[in-house]
Amino acid sequence: RYAHAIPHIDQETRLSNNRFILTLRCPDARGIIHAISGALLELEGNVFEQAQYTNESTGVFVMRTRFEANTADVEVVRARLETATAHFSPTITLRTENDLPRILIMVSQYDHCLVDLLYRQSHGEIAMDVPVIASNHEACRVIAEQYDIPFMYVPVESGVDGSKAAAESRLREIIEEYRIDAVVLARYMQILSNDLCRDLEGRVINIHHSFLPGFKGARPYHQAYDRGVKLIGATAHFVTPDLDEGPIIEQDVERVEHHQTANDLAQIGRDVERVVLARAVKLFAEDR
C-alpha cells in the first residue's frame, strides 16, 4: 500500500497547536491592523505571515495572518480578536494551524488529479485530511485502498428517474458522517444540482479545461486539435449553480506546437489540470 511504502509525514507533528491562522473581511477603515496587532500583543503573540489587501473599487478590506499565541485555546484567542475588532463588524475565521480541513475528493474515471492530490497530501505538500473518497464509478477504488482511505461508490444511472437525487442524498450523508469541510471535484463528471451548489457555496472546488465554453461536450482536446489551438489551459474554480462560472481560484496554460497530436494535447491537458487543481486546493487548505 502506498501509505506504507512512502515516507508519510504526520502533519500534526510538524505544526504547533498554539499557532493560528486568522482571516478577516470587512469594510475598509482606519485602525483595523492596529486593533489586530494590539490583540495579538495582549496574547503575547508573534506574527509569522501577514497579508492584507483593500479592493479600492468595492471598499472591502481582507487580511490573513498566521501567528503564535501564549495559549492553545482557540476560543480564548477568538474572543480577544472579536472584542478588539467589533467596531469594524468583520467576518472572521480562526483555526489552529494543526486543525486540518477535512476534504472529500470526488472522482469519476480519470484518476490523474486524484492520484496527484493524494501523493501531495501524503508527502506533506498540502496540509489537509482526506477521510473519504466518493465516485460514481468503481475505477478508482484500488487507488483509495492503496492509501487506506474509505471509498464510497455512489452510482448515478443516466436516464433513470430519481437516480441523481438519490446520489446527492447519499453525498449529503457522507459529508455529514465524515464532517467534511470542503469537496474537491477531481474530474468528477456529474453536474451538481442547484440546491446542492447553494448549500455548499464556497466549499466545492472544480477543475476543468479552459476551453469552455468554446469546446463543450466530449473529446474537448480533439476539438481543440481540429481548431489548431496554440495554448492548453485549465481552471480551478468554486462551484456555483451557474455551470463553470464560479469564482476562479487558479489557472495556468501550456503552449503547444503544430506537430503535436490530439493525444499529445490531452496529455498536456491532464498535466495542467492536476497542477492547477493542486495549487487551488493548497490555497484553500491554507485559508489563502
Residue ranges and their predicted role:
Residues 3-5:
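Short hydrophobic alpha-helical segments enriched in small aliphatic residues
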Residues 9-101:
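A conserved regulatory-domain signal marking ACT and ACT-like small-molecule sensing domains
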Residues 103-112:
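Short, glycine-rich nucleotide/cofactor-binding loops
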Residues 111-122:
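Histidine-anchored nucleotide/phosphate-binding helix
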Residues 121-129:
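A short alpha->loop->secondary-structure connector
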Residues 128-139:
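Short internal beta-strands
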Residues 137, 147, 163-166, 178-288:
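Donor/substrate-binding cores of folate-linked one-carbon enzymes
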Residues 145, 149-178:
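Adenosine-nucleotide cofactor-binding segment
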